[in-house]
């Protein structure tokens, strides 16, 4: 999280007990630490612990059940963020938050997977984190109170806002070269992108569909669009 979102925590939050893991038996895990693999994650690390400032003593003691890749097991949140920072992409993602949509958390989780430069929550400050599975702690999440705030940020940083929706004048995503400095903009699950936010975008792309449904799930569309940007620019 970032300092411009004080209501949601300011600087990155430390891991909470619900993220930690306790001892469980299982097949061998990381041989370098001699850990026991748990249902999810790894168990407590046997002592002596490695002399590594990136490691979190509480995670070493209790185990690590967080949704992180194996190389980040036992690392503190701050250490993971610092390690990810040099490889963050130029891509940003904006999500309209009008109805506390569950899909917002899923989009944030995908944004973490692609290590985007930032996520912008447009509208309501509080957003549905359930689908994020705490992955928002490792990326920058900004709150933009309104469309004008997002548009001003994008202009000031040289970014092009591209809506991912299916208005009549949208272009097929799969034949579109996305800008490198791009903000992919997503709306709510049922209503799509609001007219005001759509008007603030410099273009719109749609994902071609071949079935009977008018639109696909917005979280699925976000994953496809982020992947397409990554294919072009990573």
Annotate each PLM feature:
Residues 1-234:
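Post-transcriptional modification and biogenesis factors for structured RNAs
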């Amino acid at each position: 999280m970032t300092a411009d979102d004080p209501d949601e925590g300011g600087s990155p939050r430390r891991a909470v007990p619900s993220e930690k893991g306790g001892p469980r038996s299982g097949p061998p895990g990381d041989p370098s630490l001699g850990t026991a693999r748990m249902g999810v994650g790894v168990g407590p690390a046997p002592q002596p612990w490695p002399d590594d400032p990136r490691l979190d003593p509480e995670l070493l003691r209790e185990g690590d059940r967080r949704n992180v890749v194996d190389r980040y097991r036992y690392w503190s949140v701050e250490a993971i963020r610092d390690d990810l920072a040099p490889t963050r992409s130029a891509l940003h993602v904006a999500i309209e938050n009008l109805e506390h949509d569950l899909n917002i958390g899923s989009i944030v989780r995908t944004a973490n997977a692609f290590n985007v430069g930032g996520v912008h929550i447009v509208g309501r400050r509080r957003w549905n984190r359930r689908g994020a599975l705490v992955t928002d702690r490792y990326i920058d999440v900004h709150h933009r109170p309104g469309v004008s705030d997002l548009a001003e940020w994008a202009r000031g940083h040289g970014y092009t806002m591209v809506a991912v929706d299916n208005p009549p004048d949208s272009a097929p995503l799969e034949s579109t070269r996305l800008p490198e400095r791009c903000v992919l903009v997503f709306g709510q699950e049922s209503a799509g992108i609001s007219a005001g936010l759509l008007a603030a975008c410099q273009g719109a792309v749609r994902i071609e569909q071949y079935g009977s449904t008018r639109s696909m799930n917005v979280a699925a569309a976000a994953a496809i669009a982020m992947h397409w940007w990554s294919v072009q620019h990573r």
